[in-house]
Amino acid sequence: MQQEPMRESSDKERQPGALTLSEDDRRVLAVWAADCAERTLSLFEAQSPTDKRPREALDGVRAFARGEMRIGPVRALAAAAHAAAREVGDPAAVAAARAAGHAAATAHMAAHARGVAYAAIAAGLAAPDDPDAVADEVTWQLDHASPVVRATLRKLPPPPRPGGTLAALINDMHARIAGG
């Protein structure tokens, strides 16, 4: 079998993609996403107190943001947080673990920062009698997005517009950030 010759990658191939952004951009978003996810992490930890995977994912992405951990190990931590989400039964705990997994996955692809919407969903699921729980969490997230975080989020292309609660939250957050 003949091997294809190695070729130089083009400038376009070396540039960060629209959903990926630069490593510096991903570091900025990672800290914000981890802060958002951490607000609901206790919902997971209450259901699965010995499972540290979502917390380790947040610790890992913060280490990435400080330049102390490379992308590969953080991706593995993100995958582990998502595995933890699949293994816990409580819907609020699932959403909280997914928020942690997406925060960690931001190290690899900036668009995962939009996964903070899972934290808002977790807050809503944990407070079914509070009709404002989701909106209040989204407001907190946006209020705690620094001007640099907002500018970085604006670099992302508009999210897809499929139906469902998660997509609606992501699209609402994107519109609110894009608007100012």
Language-model segments: residues:
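C-terminal binding/interaction regions
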Residues: 2-3, 17-21, 126-180
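Structured binding/interaction patches within domain cores
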Residues: 2-142
